[in-house]
Amino acid sequence: MNKQIDDEFLTLITYLLKKGNKKMSFEILIILINVTYTMEGEMLFGKDQKVVENIASFIGNNKNDSTFVGLGLLLIKNMTNKNALVKQILYDYNIIEYFKEIYQKYILNSDIIENVILCLGHFINSRFSKNKYILFSINIIKSQLNHNNNFQRLTAYINILYNLAYTKNCEIIKKMIDEEIYKPLMEIFPFDEDNFSKFYDSTKNNDNNIIIDEETMKKKLQNMRILIIKIFQHLLLLEDNVYIQKLIDSGISQFINKLLKLSDIKIIKNTFNCIYLISFGTFGHVSDLYNNNTVSLALNVSKNVYEALNSKNQIINNNISKKDLLGALREISLAFSILIINSLYERIVPIIEYENGLILLLLKDTLKLIDELPNKRDSISYIFKAFYKILKSFDENIKEFLEKNGFKEVLEKLLNNSDEEVSKCSSTIIDEFFDDGSNDNNNININDIIKDCNFDDNKKNDVDDDDDEDDD
């Protein structure tokens, strides 16, 4: 489309919206919907505020025909998919009042409710996160929790939850936790093969579902799993121990255990990030990870990743890239570093002893690969601090084990690292634990060097959303 055609089309649409009779209404809607299925068409409507308002008025004046309403919602969903201008126009037009009215009027119509939720999801972000949208969205989700055997509804439910969490608004996050609107994801989502089969069978038997073949369903569910984990990551980023305790009381450790039994490398990476975030909490929060066997499961998974990185074990997936493995290694190192830092001595012993010191070797190799890791700067302080605590807390055998396995050589190579903190931390650990005594730096504590030792301030590393896939 060029500008002249755009202008002529918008003029025609304006005329039809004003002059068109009831009989023409469906034809007009179909034309508009078809236009929005192309990127050019989707962006077209943002060029004329009056046209968008006329479309909204046109849709709003025809609420008594469920077919028309369904098409109207589909048009709004398409128009607002990636078009910020249209979102702003409809937002200012107070389109939420239309959503509320339609929701009440067609509460039993599954397809209409699904599209209301999908439309709302497009308005739930940092730019449009006003209370009237948030509260309405939360209330809708609460009222629809028993309908998640409908795949389309479940998709909409997950997307709107993700968009709510992604606002990073503390009050919204607290409301989500208070209302426990995330809980069905922990209970009913098909994470393993058995549950997937049952879930797939239930969707085939549901008349309101669009039939999706099994392979497509598996791919969609895999993408949705990543979104679900990211929802919990954003909830755990809330720096309020009372609310983190509520998540723990609702069974988040058991949920993490489910995730640790899956083999997808992106799930592994994001699951360890959840462990890392919980480990910043109180001793009670950390203890919950031990008491629910989460740490033991995490140790087993870390072994698989470590061996895959060293090409000894293909248990994860023969097609995973080194980049994915390094991303997982970073999150595993962060999680175990914070666990070691924030755990009592007796809790650390099994981690240190696991598989003849595998975690020590994993942390050592993380330092060795530090310049290849994604977001290197986020993790370095915690790994050094963990090693410092280990060397301070345990006997000479630990030092001998590390030295025998090349730890000192790794530190020596890092002495000339371009990151000043890396070289200083390496120097401090060598001087205090591996020097022959000729250097008089033993009174320097690593905390004097690590500028990022206030873990509460550093907790809010943004969730890595690179592997999100749009699954509307």
Predicted regions and their residues:
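Alpha-solenoid helical-repeat scaffold
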Residues: 235, 281, 285, 290-291, ...
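Buried hydrophobic core positions in alpha-solenoid tandem helical repeats
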Residues: 12-14, 54-59, 98-103, 137-142, ...
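Positions within the helices of HEAT/ARM-like alpha-solenoid repeats
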Residues: 24, 68, 112, 152-153, ...
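HEAT/HEAT-like alpha-solenoid repeats
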Residues: 9, 52, 96, 137-138, ...
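Alpha-helical solenoid repeat architecture
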Residues: 1, 15, 26-41, 70-84, ...
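Short coil turns that connect the paired helices of HEAT/ARM alpha-solenoid repeats
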Residues: 18-20, 61-65, 81, 105-109, ...
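Solenoidal tandem-repeat scaffolds enriched in leucines and small polar residues
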Residues: 80-99, 103, 107-141, 150-175, ...
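Elongated alpha-helical scaffolds that mediate protein-protein interactions in large eukaryotic proteins
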Residues: 1-9, 25-26, 37-52, 82-94, ...
